[in-house]
Amino acid sequence: MATDSDNIDRTPRLGPLVDDTTVAEEIDGRDLAIVLSRYDIGSIERIVDYRKGSRRAAKMLVRTSKGSYLLKRRAAGRDDQNQVVFAHAVQHTLSQHRFPVAGLVESLDGNTLIDHDGRTYELFRFIHGHRFDNSNPAAAE
């Protein structure tokens, strides 16, 4: 299993300016228990903060008896339900056409997003990997 230091993303990136002091909110234990109880993912073995990707979205790596998952709470302002549903439809279509995407996990009621206390949560099957290296000129083609 990766250590906490392995989950710190130090990759320089282009995009919205976020200073180094920006820290993702955390998902507290109560919210974590409520949201995860909405999924059939087996018994929980370990949960750790996952700090890669956007620092604005709280993420937790959840290891269970059925596998590893990434729980993500959408950042405020990036959580419009219509946009999330659209993004999930795109991911589903890509998956059906055999594109390698982290699969969304459906909740017990068949949804791919959970609305809890006005916040939007998503659960993905966790895939180990590395950030794309776009420094290779051939990759730009």
Question: What is each PLM-predicted segment?
Answer:
Residues 17-25, 48-51, 73, 77-80:
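Short, N-terminal intrinsically disordered low-complexity segments that are rich in Pro/Gly
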Residues 2-46:
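Juxta-kinase regulatory segment immediately upstream of eukaryotic protein kinase catalytic domains
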Residues 27, 51-54, 116:
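Short secondary-structure boundary/capping elements
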Residues 39-64:
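ATP-binding glycine-rich phosphate-binding loop
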Residues 24-27, 34-42, 60, 74, ...:
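Broad hydrophobic/π-residue packing in well-ordered secondary structure
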Residues 65-141:
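ATP-binding pocket architecture of kinase catalytic cores
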